[in-house]
C-alpha cells in the first residue's frame, strides 16, 4: 500500500482543514515546495496536492504554489481541486503532474472523466468525497443524493487510474479512517482505491493495509502534528 503525504493549499500556504471547513484551517507553513521536498527526502513515493481555493472557485487558484512544488521534487504528484475541463487537465499534465483528480466534474459531467481517461491513460483519477455514504461536491459545500459506491461503479469501464475516497466527517479530525466504508467501496470495484480522511496513527495505516483491498492512503494532519512519523510509516508499509 502506498502512503501519499498531503499538501493542502490555501492562499499559497500549506494548511489542513477540519471536516472540509475553510474557516477551520490550520496553517502549517508558508513554503509548500519546501514541505514537498521534505516529504521526498523522507522517502515518499508520491505527493498528494489539493488546491482548496480551486475546489471552491471551480478553477485553479494556487497554480504558482503547485508549479513551485513540481519544480522542487522528482517523485510523482497528483492534484485535485478546481480541475473541471479538458484544457485545465491537459495544462496540468503538461506542467508535470503525474495525475489529476477529478471530483465535482465526476458527478456533474462524467463524460469528461471518460474523455480525459482515454486521452491521458493512467493519469486521471476520480475523487469521491462522501458524507454518510452520499457524495458531496464543490469543495464539499454541496451535498448530493448520489451514493459513493454507485458513482465508483459507474467508472468501472472508464479507464481511470484510481479512486480517491474521502470520508468528510473523518477528514482532519484525527478520529481514525472509516475503514469499513473504504474497504466496502474498494471491494465493489476493480479500480484501485486510495483512502483519505482520518488517518491519525501508524495503527490506522496498518489497519487500512490489512484489509487487503485498499491500494493507498493519504495522510496530512497526522504528519504535521507529529502523530505519524513519515519515515517510520513508509518503512512499516514496506515490510
UniProtKB/Swiss-Prot annotation:
What reaction is this protein's catalytic activity?
1-(5-phospho-beta-D-ribosyl)-5-[(5-phospho-beta-D-ribosylamino)methylideneamino]imidazole-4-carboxamide = 5-[(5-phospho-1-deoxy-D-ribulos-1-ylimino)methylamino]-1-(5-phospho-beta-D-ribosyl)imidazole-4-carboxamide
Q: Which Gene3D superfamilies match?
A: Aldolase class I
EC number(s) for this protein? Answer: 5.3.1.16
What's an example GO cellular component term for this entry?
cytoplasm
List, in alphabetical order, the GO biological process terms annotated in this UniProt record: L-histidine biosynthetic process; L-tryptophan biosynthetic process
Q: Report the locations given in the UniProt record.
A: Cytoplasm
Q: Which GO terms describe its molecular function?
A: 1-(5-phosphoribosyl)-5-[(5-phosphoribosylamino)methylideneamino]imidazole-4-carboxamide isomerase activity
Keyword annotations for this protein, in alphabetical order, are: Amino-acid biosynthesis, Cytoplasm, Histidine biosynthesis, Isomerase
Give coiled-coil spans as residue ranges.
Answer: none
What is the active site of this protein?
Answer: 8, 129
Tell me, in one coarse class, where this protein mainly resides: cytoplasm
Associated pathway: Amino-acid biosynthesis; L-histidine biosynthesis; L-histidine from 5-phospho-alpha-D-ribose 1-diphosphate: step 4/9
Keyword match Ribonucleoprotein:
no
Is Transcription regulation among the key words of this record?
no
Q: Which PANTHER family match?
A: 1-(5-PHOSPHORIBOSYL)-5-[(5-PHOSPHORIBOSYLAMINO)METHYLIDENEAMINO] IMIDAZOLE-4-CARBOXAMIDE ISOMERASE (PTHR43090:SF2)
Indicate the family of this protein.
Belongs to the HisA/HisF family.
Query: What is the protein's given name?
Result: 1-(5-phosphoribosyl)-5-[(5-phosphoribosylamino)methylideneamino] imidazole-4-carboxamide isomerase
Please name the source species: Cereibacter sphaeroides (strain ATCC 17029 / ATH 2.4.9)
